[in-house]
Each structure stands twice: as structure tokens, then as C-alpha cells.
A protein has these predicted regions:
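Positively charged n-region of N-terminal signal peptides that target proteins for export
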Residues: 1-7
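Bacterial N-terminal signal peptides
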Residues: 10-19
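Sec/Tat signal peptide C-region and signal peptidase I cleavage site
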Residues: 19-25
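A short beta-strand-turn-helix
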Residues: 30-48, 77
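Short active-site neighborhood of thiol/selenol oxidoreductases, capturing the structured segment around
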Residues: 44-58, 83
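Typically the conserved alpha-helix immediately C-terminal to a functionally engaged Cys/Sec
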Residues: 60-78
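Non-catalytic, surface beta->alpha helical segment in thiol-disulfide oxidoreductase systems
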Residues: 66-68, 108-153
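Structural alpha/beta surface segment adjacent to cysteine/selenocysteine redox centers
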Residues: 86-113
């Protein structure tokens, strides 16, 4: 009986250790507020990805789970971008280019009327584009690469997306 208990303890310890090691390798997106992201982007010389969502939006939840939860996407965001989230239906302000906006006003200023939407900004805070709707992880990774590697400066999205 003692041998069985020892075997069970060794197996349990091995499973626990393996689980902790796997969990340590998972990259999670470290989300900022929009205002924090604009400040940090200037200091770190990184572009910004702003996820605009609402609590009731099913596609927003799916984007969180499948796209932002994808290890490659999360790693790319962590390495190349300052990632921010904003819910325009919640209280809060966004400081952007010397002006203060409510979160709803900022979403409206970006032309966002549906959720989810993803806004991309350059290192100085200039808006690059807004992508409406849910985006699959592989497609989102293409967009992340397109902006992170500054391909957008020399190649249109149409040309780039045909190559990949």
C-alpha cells in the first residue's frame, strides 16, 4: 500500500510540475487603459493596439478567447505593441493629443460604431487604421506583422495580403 501511495505522489508531483511549466510558457496580453497606452507608446517607441469592446458583445468575448488568447498573437502584442482595452459604455477618460475624451467620445472620434473593433496607432499616437469586427488569430497575426514591421509604409494591405 505504501508503494502505491508513493507512486501516486510521484505522478501527482510530475503532473503538477508539468502544468506549472506549461502555464509559465503561456504569454498573456498585459492590457493597459487607452491613456496609459499613449503615454507608454511614446516612452517605449511602440505602436498601439486598442481593443474596443463591450461587456454584452459575444464576438468581443470570442476575440478575447480565441484571438488575444492565441499564444502567437499574445507574444507579438507583447513584443511589438502596447496593448490597450477600452469599453465605451463604461466611465473613464482618454487623454489623446492634448484633449480629454470620454471613452464613448473617443470611440466615436475613431469612427467606431460596432463591436468589437481594433484600432492601430503608430508610436506617436497617430491613427493608422480601425478594423471592425471579429478577426481570426491567423489573420490578426498578419495585421500585427504588417504594422510592426512597417510594411504599411511601402506596401498596400491589398498587395501584402495577397503575398501571405
Amino acid at each position: 500500500m505504501k508503494a502505491m501511495n508513493r507512486i501516486a505522489m510521484v505522478i501527482a508531483g510530475t503532473v503538477l510540475t508539468a502544468g506549472l511549466l506549461l502555464a509559465a510558457n503561456v504569454t498573456e496580453v498585459k492590457w493597459k487603459t487607452a491613456s496609459e497606452a499613449f503615454t507608454e507608446a511614446k516612452a517605449s517607441n511602440k505602436k498601439i493596439v486598442l481593443d474596443v469592446y463591450t461587456d454584452w458583445c459575444g464576438w468581443c468575448k470570442r476575440m478575447d478567447k480565441s484571438t488575444y488568447g492565441n499564444a502567437d498573437v499574445a507574444e507579438s502584442l507583447e513584443k511589438n505593441y502596447v496593448a490597450a482595452k477600452m469599453n465605451p459604455e463604461k466611465e473613464g477618460t482618454v487623454q489623446y493629443q492634448g484633449k480629454n475624451y470620454t471613452q464613448a467620445e473617443f470611440a466615436q472620434a475613431l469612427g467606431i460604431s460596432g463591436y468589437p473593433a481594433t484600432a492601430f496607432f503608430d508610436e506617436s499616437g497617430e491613427l493608422l487604421t480601425v478594423i471592425p469586427g471579429f478577426v481570426q488569430p491567423a489573420d490578426f497575426q498578419k495585421v500585427l506583422t504588417y504594422f510592426a514591421e512597417n510594411i504599411h509604409k511601402t506596401t498596400t494591405w491589398e498587395e501584402y495580403s495577397k503575398k501571405k
